[in-house]
Amino acid sequence: VAIDFEVIGDSEEGADRVNVLLAASRLETVDNVVSSIELGGLNAKIVDIEAFVIENTIELISGDFPVGISKDAIAVADIGYSATNFSVMENMKMIYSREETFGGLQLTEEIQRKYGLTLEEAELAKINGGLPADYEQEILEPFKGNLASQIGRALQFFYASSQISSVDILVLAGGCSSISGVAELIESRLGVKTIIANPFANMALAPKVNAESLAKHAPAMMIACGLALRGSH
């Protein structure tokens, strides 16, 4: 088991006590991350926890929340390839995190099944387009509805385990959050203001950076951006 800790302040339970944040993970999980980085020719100095990385990024983008939206309770759904990380922040501090085994892979597999493609071909078709005319109605719309249901279920799990009965805003991140209309559908289904994350919205870009391409992929860069912000505040 990989374990780390940090003293985060005095405890209300007494002058001789402090609050300590303890993080633990299976060593195998950490080793897999490190091995992936090394395959890319890099060396890992720090392995962070996704929930805390997201916390860094939410602090960055919270200034862009719609006017009048409270920041007391913020939900985040980071929709990855094979899993969705659902987390909730209270007063800008992470208080809840849960992983759901649902993500973009489910959409890719449906494309593969429907059109007789390999998984790689289906993934490329999902990204680049060119699928048959019935794709949106037969595959994409049901996937969007299923995604909304998964996030709604995750939200109900949180409410059942917390004294908080509602969140003020839901932030969508990850590649699937860029699917046209998904934020609007989720907001309509759940009755919670829903936005798509763009951690680069207020950053100055170097001339060589393709601003359009960066904006397109920005929601999928939440984790990378949060890692880059580590230690900056």
Walk through the language-model features, giving the residues of each.
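Glycine-rich phosphate-binding loop plus the immediately following alpha-helix
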Residues: 27-56, 62, 93-133
